[in-house]
Amino acid sequence: MSLKHFLNTQDWSRAELDALLTQAALFKRNKLGSELKGKSIALVFFNPSMRTRTSFELGAFQLGGHAVVLQPGKDAWPIEFNLGTVMDGDTEEHIAEVARVLGRYVDLIGVRAFPKFVDWSKDREDQVLKSFAKYSPVPVINMETITHPCQELAHALALQEHFGTQDLRGKKYVLTWTYHPKPLNTAVANSALTIATRMGMDVTLLCPTPDYILDQRYMDWAAQNVVESGGSLQVSHDIDSAYAGADVVYAKSWGALPFFGNWEPEKPIRDQYQHFIVDERKMALTNNGVFSHCLPLRRNVKATDAVMDSPNCIAIDEAENRLHVQKAIMAALASQAGIGNRE
């Protein structure tokens, strides 16, 4: 049997994702379990985290397991990922050894590695995550690289809870770009587009100009999901028409890919669109829609205080659900035949 990882949700069937969400809902009602008893996970962070680290550490503990946090370049050796490299620079270990050694110690490996924001053609290859999956003898979990599949499931669960059903078909879903003073990763936007179309919703990607449309890979995933799950997909640059009648508004900021690695000329363009902030006027156009965001969020930059403090904001519910869906993911991966068997 081939080893199953959790690198992105497109690799999992809809039935498998539904099973994870069902299990996550059960974990939400019953916090403690023994699914990871005697098992461990290495959480490898190349970038900072609050929710991801906290929820994975606590999730492993609540299921009877143990988490070890590693930060290469800080409390662990810097890692080389290119084959054939003469390692006479800053890196001390090659991923071929790192992943295999960790796999002898632990039962799961989580990886968080953001793009370097220099060359999108390289960053979109997701080298760090794919290298861990290539060499690791145990399942690897994407804790956010160029997608954020754990956030996807937390978001989906929050929507199912709010609407009181697992069937989200027919809901109008707006994924809106919002302003941020810095160009940010497209990971959460890629993932939101993916899961919303996977759930069969009518999805509108709202962004200022065509330069802010997401990478074609994720647009293609979304189009494929529309065919398989129903729903629809459109791109809009018109704020009012996009918000009109929306059931869900999901906000995220990201840098324009044509300027990737050359951000200076992108900034004055981005600065023109600060009015994309999610505010009461825009939310009033919706169908009493819910608002959410992956967090962290800069108040009164991405969304106003009034929107964040509204009873229609489910961002905190979504953040809580990170704990529950990640427990479901860890439990499912650790249950594979041979995982945890050191004999």
From Swiss-Prot:
Keywords: Amino-acid biosynthesis, Arginine biosynthesis, Cytoplasm, Transferase. Pathway: Amino-acid biosynthesis; L-arginine biosynthesis. Carbamoyl phosphate binds at residues 49-52, 77, 112, 148-151, 294-295, 322. The modification N6-carboxylysine is found at residue 302. Gene3D superfamilies: Aspartate/ornithine carbamoyltransferase. Catalyzes the transfer of the carbamoyl group from carbamoyl phosphate to the delta-amino group of N(2)-acetyl-L-ornithine to produce N(2)-acetyl-L-citrulline. This is a step in an alternative arginine biosynthesis pathway. The enzyme has no activity with ornithine. This is N-acetylornithine carbamoyltransferase. It comes from Xanthomonas axonopodis pv. citri (strain 306).
